[in-house]
């Protein structure tokens, strides 16, 4: 799994997040990013050490290199040790990442680092639950484009950390004919989807083609042209089974639309190749992480939640 921070988009997003929280108006004499409160109250020579950990069990780690990148962007002299790799499952209060550096710099970096990790760990943890629920059937668990604007690179990476797979990264890397496209193609003729697939292939011969269908009739039309994927949208499990049989050896099948964790196993049992889930990125919430640190000289102790 490629490190998410190798992506230029990820690096740019980290920079934007720090600009949002810290701006560039307040810098110390060495040019470090910092917050106004630390400038006023914290000894510039104070050095702190600490860890990030999950307060609950079963958390799937995601975003450790992002947190490290945040800290290094604030102050390159902060030492960061990754204790648990992305994709690891941790116990309550088990350290994920350790750090040492100027207290002012750590105070400046901590919230942004935690914001990234809390969201990414939540997505990875929810993805893992769906993967575990469907693994008996070998069903792929896919994400969607229902991501937070500007943060897609992190959220889709977090899905990988949880054992899921990425659907298309954007509208540029796969042809996906949804209901609105179908309505605009020959007046929405359900018996002309094979012709739509052929038109898409002529326009973009190097891209996979996927067609969303909502009925057995539409599936029968689409599969004639053998698109790489057929998306079964909001179908009953009984109809999914019929579509899977219809598409066998011709097209892969993707179940989509309102699939909950309770229903995931039943959907996977229909034999679909994959299930796609918007909830992985738009409803995962946030994992309760804590960053605890200690000032090396003196007795001051602090915790940020």
Language model regions located:
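Active-site core of metal-dependent hydrolases
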Residues: 232
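Acidic/glycine-rich phosphate/pyrophosphate-binding loops and surrounding catalytic core
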Residues: 1-225, 229, 238-246, 252-254, ...
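Short beta->alpha hinge that forms the Motif I/post-I loop of the SAM-binding pocket
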Residues: 235
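Short, charged, intrinsically disordered terminal tails
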Residues: 279-305
């Amino acid at each position: 799994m490629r490190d998410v921070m190798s992506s230029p988009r990820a690096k740019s997003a980290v920079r934007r997040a720090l600009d949002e929280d810290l701006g560039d108006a307040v810098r110390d004499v060495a040019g470090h990013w910092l917050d106004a409160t630390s400038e006023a109250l914290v000894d510039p020579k104070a050095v702190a050490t600490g860890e990030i950990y999950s307060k609950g069990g079963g958390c799937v780690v995601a975003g450790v290199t992002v947190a490290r990148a945040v800290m290094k962007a604030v102050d390159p002299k902060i030492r960061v040790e990754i204790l648990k790799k992305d994709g690891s499952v941790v116990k309550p209060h088990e350290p994920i990442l350790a750090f040492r550096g100027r207290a002012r710099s750590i105070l400046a970096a901590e919230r942004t680092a935690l914001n990234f990790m809390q969201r990414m760990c939540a997505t990875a943890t929810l993805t893992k639950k769906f993967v575990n629920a469907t693994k008996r059937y070998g069903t792929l668990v896919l994400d969607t484009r229902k991501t937070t604007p500007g943060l897609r690179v992190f959220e889709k990476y977090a899905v990988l950390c949880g054992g899921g797979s990425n659907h298309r990264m954007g509208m540029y890397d796969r042809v996906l004919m949804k209901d609105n496209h179908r309505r605009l193609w020959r007046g929405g003729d359900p018996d002309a989807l094979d012709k739509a697939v052929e038109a898409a292939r002529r326009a973009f011969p190097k891209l996979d083609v996927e067609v969303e269908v909502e009925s057995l009739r539409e599936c029968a039309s689409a599969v004639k042209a053998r698109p790489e994927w057929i998306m079964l949208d909001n179908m009953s499990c009984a109809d999914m089974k019929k579509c899977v049989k219809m598409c066998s050896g011709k097209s892969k099948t993707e179940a989509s639309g309102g699939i909950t964790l309770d229903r995931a196993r039943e959907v996977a049992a229909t034999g679909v190749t994959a299930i796609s889930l918007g909830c992985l990125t738009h409803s995962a919430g946030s994992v309760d992480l804590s960053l605890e640190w200690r000032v090396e000289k003196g007795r001051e102790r602090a915790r940020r939640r």
